[in-house]
């Protein structure tokens, strides 16, 4: 988020996230294909590939989530993952959003799609951010909804052993405009600052009385 103070005049600023996610690409692009029919077939083939990948991700995600009969089924969070190793991709929700954006773009004409590309329009985020998976060992402690500091447990017991808790955190980048103010803000009229903001997610924690349980804790989720 961009914190601004005491403006001398109204200014409208739009920011756009700068997260990057793994995706699939065809060889070449639509402009190198042999005409409208080939372009349509290329889009259809790529859409089928995306659908196949998303279906596989959904199947894997269902294996991680508790069953409906489990009383902890509602504890699942898109930014928290239980895994035996570091996740190799962003949360499924982010991938699905990227997939939806792809489908929206596929329905545009080539000319409209080129002009709608943020890179072609010279758009930049108001604040630069970075995202990564972190472990409970790196977080160690967090603040819960009551304002108390709790210990974030590194491992969660499951029927076949233990899994580690991973948190997908997004924070302001240490480089760029984080310290100099928000990009696009006129320094003559505004004082601005890029600041990391937090949200609550469910995690397995332990309080100062050694009571273990699932609690909402704060983690960094945006800039």
UniProtKB/Swiss-Prot annotation:
Cysteine-cysteine disulfides: 127-194, 172-223
GO CC annotation, single: extracellular space
A Pfam family: NGF
Pro-sequence residue ranges: 6-114
A biological process from GO: nerve development
InterPro entries: Brain-der_neurotrophic_factor, Cystine-knot_cytokine, Nerve_growth_factor-like, Nerve_growth_factor-rel, Nerve_growth_factor_CS
Alphabetized GO MF terms: growth factor activity; nerve growth factor receptor binding
Gene3D superfamilies in alphabetical order: Cystine-knot cytokines
Residues carrying sugar: 107
Endpoints of the signal sequence: 1-5
Keyword annotations from UniProtKB, A to Z: Cleavage on pair of basic residues, Disulfide bond, Glycoprotein, Growth factor, Secreted, Signal
Major localization class: secreted
Record localization: Secreted
Role, per record: Promotes the survival of neuronal populations that are all located either in the central nervous system or directly connected to it.
PANTHER family, per database record: BRAIN-DERIVED NEUROTROPHIC FACTOR, NERVE GROWTH FACTOR NGF -RELATED
Family under the similarity heading: Belongs to the NGF-beta family.
Protein's name in the database: Neurotrophic factor BDNF precursor form
High-level lineage: Eukaryota, Metazoa, Chordata, Craniata, Vertebrata
Chain's gene name: BDNF
């Amino acid at each position: 988020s961009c914190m601004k103070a005491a403006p001398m005049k109204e200014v409208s600023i739009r920011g756009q996230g700068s997260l990057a996610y793994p995706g699939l690409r065809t060889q070449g692009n639509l402009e190198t294909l042999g005409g409208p029919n080939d372009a349509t077939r290329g889009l259809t083939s790529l859409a089928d590939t995306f659908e196949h990948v998303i279906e596989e991700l959904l199947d894997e995600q269902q294996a991680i989530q508790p069953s409906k009969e489990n009383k902890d089924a509602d504890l699942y969070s898109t930014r928290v993952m239980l895994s035996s190793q570091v996740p190799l991709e962003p949360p499924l929700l982010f991938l699905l959003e990227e997939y939806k954006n792809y489908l929206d773009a596929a329905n545009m004409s080539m000319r409209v799609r080129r002009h709608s590309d943020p890179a072609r329009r010279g758009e930049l985020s108001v604040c630069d951010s970075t995202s990564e998976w972190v472990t409970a060992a790196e977080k160690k402690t967090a603040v819960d909804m009551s304002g108390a500091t709790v210990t974030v447990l590194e491992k969660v017991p499951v029927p076949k052993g233990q899994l580690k808790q991973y948190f997908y955190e997004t924070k302001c980048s240490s480089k760029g405009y984080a310290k100099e103010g928000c990009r696009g803000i006129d320094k003559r009229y505004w004082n601005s600052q890029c600041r990391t903001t937090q949200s609550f997610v469910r995690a397995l924690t332990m309080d100062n009385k050694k009571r273990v349980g699932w609690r909402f804790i704060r983690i960094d989720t945006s800039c």
